[in-house]
C-alpha cells in the first residue's frame, strides 16, 4: 500500500519553536490592543471577541478586558480558536510589512520539494490557524512553499492530543491510516495519531523529549519514502 501522504506538525518539527515563542507570540501580544480597537467592527474580529467572552464566561467583558484575556491566553499558550484566528490576522500584517519572515528548518525546505516531486501529498497540522500556517510557509526564509502543500489543519479539526482529530484528517483526505505518516516532536501527539492508525515518526531536534516508543529522525534528510 505504501505511504501516500505526510502530515507534519509545525512548531519544533518544521519550524524552530523559538521563532514561535520569541518572535510571533510577543508580536501578537504587543499588537492586540490596537488591532482590536481598529478592527472591532470587522465581522470576523467581532466573532472572535464574542467567542472569547463565551469561552472566558465573561459575557459583559469590554474590549479592554477581552484584550487582557487574550494576552493571558498567549502567556498560557492556550489553544483557543478565537485567539489563534486573531493571531493569524495580526501576523498577516507583520509578514506583509516585512517585519519578519517565517522560519523553516532548511532540511524541511529540501524535503518538501523532494516529497512533492514524488507526488506525495503534504499537509500541516498545527494549533495555529490555517491562515497562520499559510503565512508561515508563504513568507518563509526559503521562499513560498505553499504550492507544495495539499492542505492545512488547525484546531477546527480537533485537539492535537485527541485521536479523533487524526480520524477527522483521515476522513478529509480520504486515505487509509497506513497510507499516512504523521511527523511531530511531541510524544502525546504521536500517541494520538497512532491510536487513529496512522504511521508515526518523531522529530528529535535539540530540545525534544525522547522516547523509545517511536521511530526517530533528527532531520527530514533522514526521512526517505520509497
Swiss-Prot record:
Cofactor: Mg(2+)
GO biological process, one term: L-methionine salvage from methylthioadenosine
Broad EC category: hydrolase
InterPro entries reported for this sequence: Enolase-ppase_E1, HAD-like_sf, HAD-SF_hydro_IA, HAD_sf
Keywords attached to this entry: Amino-acid biosynthesis, Hydrolase, Magnesium, Metal-binding, Methionine biosynthesis
Function: Bifunctional enzyme that catalyzes the enolization of 2,3-diketo-5-methylthiopentyl-1-phosphate (DK-MTP-1-P) into the intermediate 2-hydroxy-3-keto-5-methylthiopentenyl-1-phosphate (HK-MTPenyl-1-P), which is then dephosphorylated to form the acireductone 1,2-dihydroxy-3-keto-5-methylthiopentene (DHK-MTPene).
SUPFAM superfamilies listed in its UniProt record: HAD-like
Protein name stated in the entry: Enolase-phosphatase E1
Gene: mtnC
Top-rank taxon, per record: Bacteria
Statement: the UniProt record of this protein carries the keyword Hydrolase: yes
Subunit field text: Monomer.
Native source organism of the sequence: Shewanella baltica (strain OS185)
Organism lineage: Bacteria, Pseudomonadati, Pseudomonadota, Gammaproteobacteria, Alteromonadales
Pfam families reported for this sequence: Hydrolase
Cofactor binding mode and count: Binds 1 Mg(2+) ion per subunit.
Reactions accelerated catalytically: 5-methylsulfanyl-2,3-dioxopentyl phosphate + H2O = 1,2-dihydroxy-5-(methylsulfanyl)pent-1-en-3-one + phosphate
Family membership: Belongs to the HAD-like hydrolase superfamily. MasA/MtnC family.
One annotated GO molecular function: magnesium ion binding
Pathway, per record: Amino-acid biosynthesis; L-methionine biosynthesis via salvage pathway; L-methionine from S-methyl-5-thio-alpha-D-ribose 1-phosphate: step 3/6; Amino-acid biosynthesis; L-methionine biosynthesis via salvage pathway; L-methionine from S-methyl-5-thio-alpha-D-ribose 1-phosphate: step 4/6
Assigned EC number: 3.1.3.77
Amino acid at each position: 500500500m505504501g505511504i501516500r501522504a505526510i502530515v507534519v506538525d509545525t512548531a519544533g518539527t518544521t519550524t524552530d519553536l523559538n521563532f514561535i515563542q520569541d518572535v510571533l507570540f510577543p508580536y501578537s501580544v504587543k499588537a492586540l490592543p490596537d488591532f482590536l480597537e481598529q478592527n472591532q467592527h470587522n465581522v470576523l474580529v467581532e466573532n472572535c471577541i464574542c467567542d472569547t467572552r463565551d469561552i472566558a464566561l465573561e459575557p459583559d467583558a469590554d474590549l479592554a478586558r477581552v484584550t487582557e484575556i487574550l494576552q493571558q491566553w498567549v502567556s498560557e499558550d492556550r489553544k483557543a480558536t478565537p485567539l489563534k484566528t486573531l493571531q493569524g490576522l495580526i501576523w498577516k500584517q507583520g509578514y506583509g510589512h516585512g517585519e519578519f519572515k517565517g522560519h523553516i528548518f532548511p532540511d524541511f525546505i529540501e524535503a518538501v520539494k523532494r516529497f512533492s516531486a514524488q507526488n506525495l501529498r503534504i499537509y500541516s497540522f498545527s494549533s495555529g490557524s490555517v491562515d497562520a500556517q499559510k503565512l508561515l510557509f508563504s513568507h518563509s526564509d526559503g521562499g513560498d512553499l505553499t504550492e507544495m502543500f495539499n492542505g492545512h489543519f488547525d484546531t477546527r479539526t480537533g485537539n492535537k492530543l485527541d485521536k479523533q482529530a487524526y480520524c477527522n484528517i483521515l476522513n478529509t483526505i480520504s486515505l487509509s491510516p497506513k497510507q499516512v505518516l504523521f511527523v511531530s516532536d511531541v510524544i502525546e501527539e504521536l500517541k494520538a495519531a497512532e491510536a487513529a492508525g496512522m504511521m508515526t515518526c518523531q522529530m528529535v531536534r535539540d530540545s525534544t523529549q525522547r522516547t523509545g516508543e517511536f521511530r526517530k529522525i533528527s532531520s527530514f534528510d533522514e526521512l526517505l519514502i520509497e
